[in-house]
Amino acid sequence: MNNQDRVQKPSKPAANSLKQAEKKKREVFKAVLASPYSRRNLWPAVSVELQNNLVDLLCSILEEIGTFNRLSQAEKNSSGLEKPSISEYVIYGFNSCMKALEEQSKKIQSMKLVLNSDHILRYLFVCKLDMTTPLLFQHFPILSAYANVKLIQLPKNTHQKLQKVLGLKKPIEVLVLAKGAAKMYPLLAELAEGVEDVDIEFLRSGPFEAKIKHILTQQTVKK
């Protein structure tokens, strides 16, 4: 067979090919300029030194909880040990922290929050760099603003340190401390209060309503 008899494959799929047919477009709205409603990743700056100091202090505070968690149920029953007092003011785990923050946010909005309670959430620690996708952490600035808590980013690999000190089977990427913990450990409060509050412009009350313009465009959808 000579070169002229060979069948050459098209370099690109034809316009009516199955591959092209699989590509569809859908209509979407996109902001003309940056929208304040989409600026979710506004994290307060925390120096490396402060982050490391906070991690060391947190590990020291949580060690008592870890000792209790490592005991079997039989050991807890036979020894008569109760949870450490600090446990009352510590919440860890993504789902548990989210639920607590959302509940506090609702209480603030409805003006039902007991201001002098030691159980008011005060500090939200997030291992942002240890999370696998931004979807897991990009909402925390807005949520922390609504819940009126300090948002503090911790260094990479802190999730494993928290897992170890708490005696758990899975890494801990989110940790919340209540006001009572700050009373028990004044140094913790002093360090954490050094972090600025989340500042999100559109959450502030203003004389004019924010108007965000959008355009209708198309986005390719692949099957």
Place the predicted regions along the sequence by residue.
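Sequence-level detector for tyrosine residue identity
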Residues: 37, 89-92, 123, 140, ...
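Short acidic, S/G/P-rich loop/turn micro-motifs used as interaction or catalytic elements
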Residues: 97, 129-133, 181-183
